[in-house]
């Protein structure tokens, strides 16, 4: 059967039949055989025949009424198909065929090379193969084990399906469709279109300036985008894409994994699209929005931007930027040295780990549960963070930024220039509040809170660490359970509760309305306090320190070494004045004032309590309605003793100018009283006592 055939319409049988070239057709002429009819025709041509010698055809023209069949060593050169059909199978070959209209069918081991398709189509199936095809206006179909190599599409279409395979296709200005189990390998798209869907696959495609569309179950592997566009959507997937200078868009259920974005490359992820294990190198860009998501992205100098409902998780920033804004969100980002995460305008970052890089939160952005191992978290201009753990780096809050529930294990929280924080726990590091910064409800378990230069704090709990207030810093309502509050150099505090620790006021520091339940308040070197309530602990005033309006309910006020106090009320505790200390206008309702070793008091009112003056201590202008004891070198001047009061002078004690107005003065055993005035009451002088 190796010859030229005609296909004609048989009027009587109502079907197409194959005849020899001498048979003339009658009836209707066809333009192109339908592929459903083609299968039966091919089967007919494959019926067993008597073996024939291989034939060679040159320069044949197949018009609408003719066809050619090549098999078993047959070959045709320079055939032109102008409406007819050429069948190549079983070892037949067609070389340098031109298809203007009609069809070339290659199957069952047939081959074709250097075909030009201007119109019509070429069909390769069932083990057929073609090489070096140029499609400039027609179609090429590859299926069922057929293959095409080195095809150039410059205006036509290549269809690959059902096990067909196209290798090294170049699309200059046309269309390649891969579907239903078809595959394309090493395609180069310069200006055309590649469409992969429904189980089709493309491997090692290079997109220079054209378009690759992967959807509906199609897949693309190892694509390189130099300047064109790759779209993955509707169940399509792309693996190991390299974007050099073009665009990959992943949307509407598309999936991309292992993408590498190099300089000038862009990846867009939106509308339910997802990307996994993307690498963004220097100059690359990944943009995620509108329900798109990215997982396990590595940023090595490029930019990842998440906004408008986009999300990213498990990103690693080695260098470069991650930007979250306008409703975008990220989780579990790790930032290394040289990397930066920027969150603003309603962006949200959760679970970020800063390990040498920086997280910047501003302008309505927020970060939750950040861990700072080393590096910097900066919050400013309306940014806010919560649940940050600082275990080695720095959190900087300024210019309207806010931080809530930060834990400082090791490292530094700095608050300044209008920044504010609340609920910070310091368990080993430092909190520094300055220049208009503020902190509320800080807990210092171990470590340091420093407040200076206009910084202010309130509600701090010190349960083991230290609070240092200086240089215009202020603290309100601090509780010192265990640890130290230090106030100096112009620092000031108010409402401090000391229930086990210590408050140290010096060098121009001041404290107002401190309550000492248990522990110590120390005031020295120019420090000053007022309104202190001692209800169980101790207040120690020395070396130029001063205290005003202290109330001692239970506990001790000690004044020595140049310390001075005024307006103290003792209603159950003790005031101890010695070694150059002084007290003015003390009122003793219940309790004891002891003055010795060079201590001095003035204007004390004893209204039920006791005053003991000894060993070089002195008291002036005391009002006595209780008990005053002067002994062992102590001296008093101008004590007024009212009814119910008693002044006892003994053992080298001296009282001068006492006025007895209803009470009693008792002088005994080496005591002496000079210039006493008895207006009413009793002066009793015992053996060894002297009055004059």
What function would you assign to each model-found segment?
Residues 56-72:
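Short N-terminal segments immediately surrounding and downstream of signal-peptide cleavage
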